[in-house]
Amino acid sequence: MKISEIREMSAQEITGKLTELKKEFFNLRFQHGVGQLENTAILPSIRKDIARLMTVCREMNLNIS
């Protein structure tokens, strides 16, 4: 997910996507701990997407463009 795509989203869409990614990350971490996750490279990718969403959300709160 690109930062430009995130900036085009509304605050509600960002919050919804953030919740969705956090749930997915939790499930993937659990699978990784149990040893069922085959593609472990997806974990850092999701973590970075969560960080991007949180950054844009914070920018919106501070009215930074």
Swiss-Prot record:
Family membership: Belongs to the universal ribosomal protein uL29 family.
Keywords per UniProt: Ribonucleoprotein, Ribosomal protein
Keyword hit for Ribonucleoprotein: yes
InterPro entries in the record: Ribosomal_protein_uL29, Ribosomal_uL29, Ribosomal_uL29_sf
Superkingdom: Bacteria
Entry's Gene Ontology molecular function annotations: structural constituent of ribosome
Gene3D superfamilies (alphabetical): 1.10.287.310
Protein name per UniProt: Large ribosomal subunit protein uL29
A cellular-component GO term for this protein: cytosolic large ribosomal subunit
BP terms from Gene Ontology: translation
Annotated transmembrane regions: none
Pfam families: Ribosomal_L29 (PF00831)
